[in-house]
């Protein structure tokens, strides 16, 4: 599974990041996983819906399981994958065509994109579990990135 690493930007440059479109950020700490959707808004500069809040997710089952959350967020890819699988089963497309079209689906704007951020206490097992769940949910764009200072503060409040 390819992971996308963002380019390192020098601290003194004043480049605004692109708008987050259909993005979920997972933050791993100890054996816990937290997430937020969309852009990060600190308490000092809240967005339209207020500052960003972290929600805890789990790798088990239930309403807040990573698998269930990803399935609901990535329904565009999952529904279209089912259509492609039907065509593959009926021999209307080749398996190489299926793989290419599925790969194209995961890169469309409607497909969910995931940022993975970890602190110093995050367990390797949690990272691997999350990447496994992302693969199961057919998430095509996964980018491990560093925690921002605002995200670190928010994480301290949760731990």
Task: Please place each PLM-identified region on the residue numbering.
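Extracytoplasmic juxtamembrane/flexible linker immediately downstream
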Residues: 1-68, 76-101, 105-106, 143-159
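Soluble extracytoplasmic domains of inner/organellar membrane proteins
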Residues: 102-142, 151
């Amino acid at each position: 599974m390819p992971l996308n690493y963002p380019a390192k930007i020098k601290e003194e440059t004043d480049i605004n990041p692109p708008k987050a479109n259909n993005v979920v950020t997972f933050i791993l700490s100890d054996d816990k996983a937290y997430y937020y959707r969309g852009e990060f808004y600190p308490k000092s500069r809240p967005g339209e819906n207020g500052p960003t809040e972290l929600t805890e997710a789990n790798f088990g089952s239930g309403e807040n399981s990573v698998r269930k959350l990803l399935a609901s967020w990535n329904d565009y890819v999952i529904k279209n994958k089912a259509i492609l699988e039907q065509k593959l089963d009926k021999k209307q497309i080749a398996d190489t065509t299926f793989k290419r079209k599925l790969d194209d689906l995961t890169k469309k704007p409607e497909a969910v994109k995931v940022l993975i951020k970890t602190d110093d206490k995050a367990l390797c097992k949690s990272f691997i579990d999350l990447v496994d769940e992302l693969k199961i949910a057919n998430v095509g764009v996964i980018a491990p990135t560093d925690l921002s200072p605002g995200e670190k503060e928010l994480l301290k409040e949760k731990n």
